[in-house]
Amino acid sequence: RINLQSRFQWPSFDAYQTYAASFDTYFRSAKSGLGLFVLSDIQGEGFISTSEIKGLYSYQLNMRNDWTVRFGTELGFGQKFYDWDKYVFLDQIDPITGDVSDQSFSEEARPESLQANYFDISSGILFASKSVYAGLSLRHMNRGNDGIILLNENRLSNGVPLMVSMQFGTQIDLNRGNKRNSTAFISPNVLIVKQGDFGQVNAGAYISSSFVFGGAWYRYSWTNADAAVLMVGVQSGIFKLGYSYDFTVSALQAYSSGGAHEIAVSFRFDQSDYFKSRAKKYNSIDCLQLFR
């Protein structure tokens, strides 16, 4: 499977532009999966640019009553660049007019290096049956240091905060009377994320038929409502295309942020007639339909 994604958050502010690509495959005989993930993220018209590349490995342990446990680990390398010349400091602002001159000069000390390189380690576990799943993941376990400000040759940053996420949900078959061609289902699900002092909850449902799919979620942070998310897409054979939009419902909506647009394209080779006819022989992806 190959996935391509792009996300534009708060486009009215030129805030975040994110591009990602990934590949994963499953080796049935080894009960294992391998994957590769690359990401490029641009914040504030290039004030901060982040690039990452990560390798993934997972292992499936079969249990009783059709339950499985999947263990996964992710090892990666990241690079963060700070465009110092785009920053505006207090001593560059005219105290009377508030203007910033192109020729203004700041006495802020320019860091010796504007680039930070770091390693990243993550892991997770997923319990799943044919209709229910629950998972826990830990990201940035080693807290790689992505800061550039030095104090006595040590970076002031304490590293990337540990991210803990929990997810659980169910998959309900909507074609129980026609199990041979059962493709339609609905999946209510919840995602809880905690990183540093920040936390949020996503709750909603994903629905899919043989050709179209969609979903709706509500995202709430620890202190306020954040966004309502709607998604719609089409799928046929190996091809899957989805679009989602985040409707801002926080106080930020007063500033016409533009919400967030996300487009995702997947090429699911395990859904081709060739691989379906040889599912036991070749490397078909073995998971709930929700994750395909």
Labelled PLM ranges:
Residues 1-292:
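Subset of outer-membrane beta-barrel
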